[in-house]
Amino acid sequence: MKNQGRLAQNSDECEAKYIYIQDLPSKCNDDLLEKCDTLNKWLNMCEYLTNSGLGPRLNYSTSWYATNQFSLEVIFHNKMKQYRCLTNISSKASAVYVPFYAGLDVGRYLWDDDDIKIRDNASIQLVEYLKEKPEWIKMGGHDHFLVAGRVSWDFRRQTDSVSDWGNTLFNLLEVKNMTSLVIESSPWSNIDFAIPYSTYFHPSSDDEIYVWQEQMRQKHRPNLFSFVGAPRVQLRDSIRNEIINQCLGSKGKHCEFLKCDGIIKNCDEPKNVMRLFKRSVFCLQPPGDSYTRRSTFDSILGGCIPVFFHPASAYVQYLWHFPKNYTSYSVFIPMEDVNKGDFAIEKRLLEIPKEKVVAMREEVIKLIPKVIYANPSSKLERFEDAFDIAVKGVLSRIEGIRMDMLRGNNNNNSNFESFPEEYSWKYNFFGGLENLEWDSYFSRG
């Protein structure tokens, strides 16, 4: 597949920013799109992969789409084709983008107890192909990056049992040399980095963002807090049931609950979800099947202050996109507090001074451009979107590794120092290993 898009014209503005798109066999991307009806056991993905991966346009706006949360690698690829510093001379590039649709590939097999060789086949063939390319030899793959539009755990199968989850993409030695972008990273790894889930809003101009931000500032928010989701009865440690009970039992009728289940399909309609977020001051974001939720980014888009219960739901994930000062834009309530049974979320939120709430909401609204992916067919002039920030993060990381290799240090750490990989979350967020604040959340003993 020929992947080159708009090539850079001005070499000065692109110094240290050039990216080369690696040509891959069509089975790595285009063929998957052609077989879109086979990509998900429960859902026909074909309509969601239209419009450059944005999905079908919603009736009520030209910039709103029914975007599927697992179509990010297609969106990213189409935006990369319009990247202003593309080059078709690989030796000139600071980074090499590998447009393998890893998430679409593995999604075909996640719920099947098939031969694990089928799950791993495309990933193994990819690295065998890359190793033979001259671009790989330059840095042994350390300057390569890919986007896998699912959570990290889908690519980290721990055993060769057919009942174990996922494939082994991130376990391959060659891929460990690369930088992988996912919608949820492993806190104990230094090869994958989280970037925002896609929202429904894909503006084509800066003015659309300005208008939306101002609308969110002016919104009347009758709900103190809200929750969009479903119970997790099968997850023993889940706090969702307690959160739902507290929302439904709010003494001042301060909470609104939008139940997501397979019968009513309330949450499949973007208008329902966004309506609730726009009516709420705070939006509860407990872990679900994994640490993170697409709902976090939809709520930010709605100007709603997120409330997190685990630091891996946002703080140690989206290091390039969210402020390090997490109290400026969110509320953190430890999971163990909620599990005590006598802790009232409503009371905790009511204790926050009004002026603090106003300041937090403004920070959330400022985050909106950073968590949306603008329409690939357009270019923002004054804002950097989630794609722009991710590319800057990748280039910075690769440059650091390149300088490290020149100094003779080849540890592949994003902060260019040697530390145990299991403490990646701590080093990347706190800048060192001494802080003990969140150790209990990440202990694997």
Model-identified regions with their sequence ranges:
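C-terminal amphipathic helix plus adjacent low-complexity
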Residues: 9-15, 331-445
